[in-house]
């Protein structure tokens, strides 16, 4: 059985595989949002070797937490109308090698990711206010 099957993951529109693991029971309407959101949500997110997370952004802060396998390059691309690469982080198991065990993607920031080894990478992502696909934007193809 593959890791995707064991973790009961499904394909994510940005690339990779995910499953929502928690949604806060408290809802509210944050300033600037088009409707009610959960206070926070959490997913497991797997990027197997050879796959990538395309440039995208969400309206809320997103905290990446390394869970297993190999390190991932997390690219931050600013908050402009299109991603502008320039700030790469590594989320992974080895702080001595400069890896971050946790990394914050600020609300509205473009982000993309890719595994740095053939092991792929597994992270948890916590979004607050909680994730809603209405708050998700993929960059135009080619970005």
Task: List the predicted regions and their residue ranges.
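Non-catalytic, conserved peripheral segments adjacent to functional cores
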Residues: 1-103, 110-113, 118-120, 125-133, ...
């Amino acid at each position: 059985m593959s890791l995707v099957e064991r973790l009961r993951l499904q394909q994510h529109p940005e690339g990779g595989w995910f499953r929502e693991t928690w949604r806060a029971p408290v809802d509210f309407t944050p300033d600037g949002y088009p409707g009610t959101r959960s206070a926070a949500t959490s997913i497991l997110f797997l990027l197997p070797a050879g796959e990538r997370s395309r440039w995208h952004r969400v309206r809320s802060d997103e905290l990446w937490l390394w869970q297993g396998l190999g390190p991932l390059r997390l690219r931050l691309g600013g908050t402009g109308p299109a991603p502008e690469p320039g700030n790469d982080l590594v989320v992974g198991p080895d702080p001595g090698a400069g890896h971050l065990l946790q990394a914050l993607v600020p609300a509205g920031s473009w982000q993309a990711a890719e595994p740095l080894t053939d092991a792929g990478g597994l992270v948890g992502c916590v979004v607050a206010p909680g994730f809603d696909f209405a708050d998700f934007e993929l960059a135009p193809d080619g970005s």
